C-alpha cells in the first residue's frame, strides 16, 4: 500500500476532493494508482494527480 495525497481538481462525480489522503495500490501496468472513494468504488488516479505522502 502506498499513502498519497490527491492534488488534482476536485471530482464530484468520483466523490474525491483536492487534499484527500488515500492508501492506494499501483495498477498492473504501473501507469496509475487505484484508490477507493467514500462509497467503496475503485477510482483510478494518474501519477500527475497525486503526491506520495
Protein language model features and the residues they cover:
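Basic/aromatic-rich interaction segments and small domains that mediate binding to polyanionic partners
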Residues: 2-48
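Short hydrophobic/aromatic patches at helix-to-coil boundaries
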Residues: 50-53
